[in-house]
Amino acid sequence: MNLISKNKITFIFLFSIFLLPAYGANKDTKAIYELIERVTPGYSSQYRLEIIAPDNGVDVYEVDGNGKEIILRGNTPVALATAFNWYLKYTCQAHVSWFGNQLNLPEKLPQPRERERRVINGRYRVYMNYCTVSYTAAWWDWERWQKELDFMAMNSVNMPLFTIGLDAVWYNTLLHFNFSDREARAFLAGPGHAAWQWMQNLQSYGGPLPKSVIDLSLIHI
């Protein structure tokens, strides 16, 4: 399996944490331990992650301590990541954002002052739109995508826009209506302008769309 394929599989696994409840505790906590280590290298061993039940069907998280470890609890991986972000903000006075991080953390992390329990507002926390994918994300590599996925989870997002494979849907629909391969790809906009194609504002701009891009989108699914 080549590196690109491994990255695709990892992308799908991480993306799936936004959509599924936490049934496999070990797998789900492992994903968030890895997130913690990416955001704050060297600190993941100071945390203990626990899966808890939802609060009357609503996502919930807790931040607690036992004198030795920082205890993060949540009913989903996203809830656990949200607890991690809350702890960084309000106990460590740290900050993680798109434009820069303030992560001046002591070697030994401080204990929370008291147990904090919070319900996450909204069953579905939606993020991104078509334009996001073409303005910036069309050119992201795996490292940048992983950073964005971590940021989404830490900010409670559980329903990001998922456009992977949409190019293939358009392409195969056009073939169904007797477009040739060349005609179909010429009709489709290039990756940097796909959003406006999907919103039916333009066609063909920046194209023809390479078949390799269409095939790549199918591998992601």
Describe the function of each predicted region.
Residues 2-11:
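Bacterial N-terminal signal peptides that target proteins for export
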Residues 34-35, 41, 52-56, 65-219:
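Feature activates predominantly on carbohydrate-active enzymes
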Residues 24-25, 38-40:
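Surface-exposed cap/linker segments adjacent to membranes
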Residues 15-23:
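Hydrophobic h-region of N-terminal signal peptides that target proteins for export
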